[in-house]
Amino acid sequence: MSNMDIDGINTGTIDKTPEEITSGTSGATRPIIKPATLAPPSNKRTRNPSPERAATSSEADVGRRTQKKQTPTEIKKSVYNMVVKLGEFYNQMMVKAGLNDDMERNLIQNAHAAERILLAATDDKKTEFQKKKNARDVKEGKEEIDHNKTGGTFYKMVRDDKTIYFSPIRITFLKEEVKTMYKTTMGSDGFSGLNHIMIGHSQMNDVCFQRSKALKRVGLDPSLISTFAGSTLPRRSGATGVAIKGGGTLVAEAIRFIGRAMADRGLLRDIRAKTAYEKILLNLKNKCSAPQQKALVDQVIGSRNPGIADIEDLTLLARSMVVVRPSVASKVVLPISINAKIPQLGFNVEEYSMVGYEAMALYNMATPVSILRMGDDAKDKSQLFFMSCFGAAYEDQRVLSALTGTEFKHRSALKCKGFHVPAKEQVEGMGAALMSIKLQFWAPMTRSGGNEVGGDGGSGQISCSPVFAVERPIALSKQAVRRMLSMNIEGRDADVKGNLLKMMNDSMTKKTNGNAFIGKKMFQISDKNKTNPIEIPIKQTIPNFFFGRDTAEDYDDLDY
């Protein structure tokens, strides 16, 4: 079993410079096709009034219209306030749990336990559903469960001579008590903080698990995984969650809805169901980068009785998104245990950007520790943690390697499992290790698909979803995409399908060389003001794709 020396944690050293592990390329450019904004008056995208649903009351809508728009500085100040308050809430939770040692508070699993308890406590809609279901179960003679309480597994430190271990303890909280503590700390309902945590959990799931079963269930090929970002985000994450979701995730939601509508033809006569379906399609249209993609979504929106033809259209749309990538937001989400350390780290700023320098500097300052499950390698676990924080599951690994000075591996080559420890693996005296991979260079994050060019890629996963805005080629497995292009385009919308397939073919033939994000450079981690831009070197021998013919656990197999 793994253990850790109390006097000094061996985190490993980086023996190579980024230049030694990478080498550069460059080439021609094409302009980005910027997505048009779809904003019909009746479908304005607005903030969630509550974390339980993605609807907006008319009063809140009026309030937003009269509200003064925040400046970038004001936004960064409010974001800083949010992350600091989340850290304060975590400290209060740990005091209540009786876990006061720094090592216990640095533990990623303890942060995740506190986050899950908070999400459960604030999900009033789910709590109400559980209570009603339990009332029915009790009438049938089943055991009564108190759904006013929620709990999680925390880990308490145990010292043994010069070695420290962690032992699991189950701690229960009253939901109302957790909600009150959170609202008091945040000074409001704190919906943005809840969304922030949900996105962090989703990014961790994207990295730790493959989603082959979920893709196959809706008729999509597992190789489209790079379009499946945010697939485990709950609906209550609202507009913030939609920005993080990949195009394939929204396609899968629409296909599932059509499947339900085909089984129950009365479903779309219900105004609430019809509105929800239309909202998914409008969000999908907003994601699309090319007019041909938007036209295909319009065909589906115009269908009076959605069926097999619409599913075929959406399947083609998902395939096109590996060539012409949709708009997917990226952000750095750190465990709230790191936020709790901001005062001690000397992180003296009053502004914080989740897509810029401040989040990356805070990541580098932190000393997060993770439980090691049986067979886990500490360095491999560090790669999982880095990619989780930066939402980089589908980023080109050559870019990540250059930014960190560490050679990144395929998911199936990593000797480690996810961060959640199943009940059957929770034993006394578990080892832990410091997450050691740090940034040597930094670059702003992007929401663009980087559609100027497409280079050559590998197999398994067949495309990337860029996270960092740095000039580089975009990896794409053209052989795999060409296999997808051989499909029937006959039917009611043959012209629309034909145009989309032509666009994909044109992209494949023209975009063979060159770089995306032209002119975007990386910077030394100490260079906050971007005074010395550095061209990112790309080494072709490092694998492009994290999920290449993968053998990782599937999210659907998780035993919570």
Swiss-Prot record:
Annotated segments matching region Disordered: 1-74
Keywords: Capsid protein, Helical capsid protein, Host nucleus, Host-virus interaction, Ribonucleoprotein, RNA-binding, Viral nucleoprotein, Viral penetration into host nucleus, Virion, Virus entry into host cell
One Gene Ontology MF term: structural molecule activity
GO cellular component: helical viral capsid; host cell; host cell nucleus; ribonucleoprotein complex; viral nucleocapsid
Record's keyword annotation contains Cytoplasm: no
GO biological process: symbiont entry into host cell; viral penetration into host nucleus
Compositionally biased intervals (Polar residues): 10-28
Intrachain disulfide bonds: none
Description of post-translational modifications: Late in virus-infected cells, may be cleaved from a 56-kDa protein to a 53-kDa protein by a cellular caspase. This cleavage might be a marker for the onset of apoptosis in infected cells or have a specific function in virus host interaction.
UniProt keyword annotation of Magnesium present: no
Cell location: Virion; Host nucleus
Alphabetical list of Pfam families matching this protein: Flu_NP
Subunit: Homomultimerizes to form the nucleocapsid. May bind host exportin-1/XPO1. Binds to viral genomic RNA. Protein-RNA contacts are mediated by a combination of electrostatic interactions between positively charged residues and the phosphate backbone and planar interactions between aromatic side chains and bases.
Function, as annotated: Encapsidates the negative strand viral RNA, protecting it from nucleases. The encapsidated genomic RNA is termed the ribonucleoprotein (RNP) and serves as template for transcription and replication. The RNP needs to be localized in the host nucleus to start an infectious cycle, but is too large to diffuse through the nuclear pore complex. NP comprises at least 2 nuclear localization signals that are responsible for the active RNP import into the nucleus through cellular importin alpha/beta pathway.
Family the UniProt entry places it in: Belongs to the influenza viruses nucleoprotein family.
Official protein name in the record: Nucleoprotein
Organism the protein comes from: Influenza B virus (strain B/Ann Arbor/1/1966 [cold-adapted])
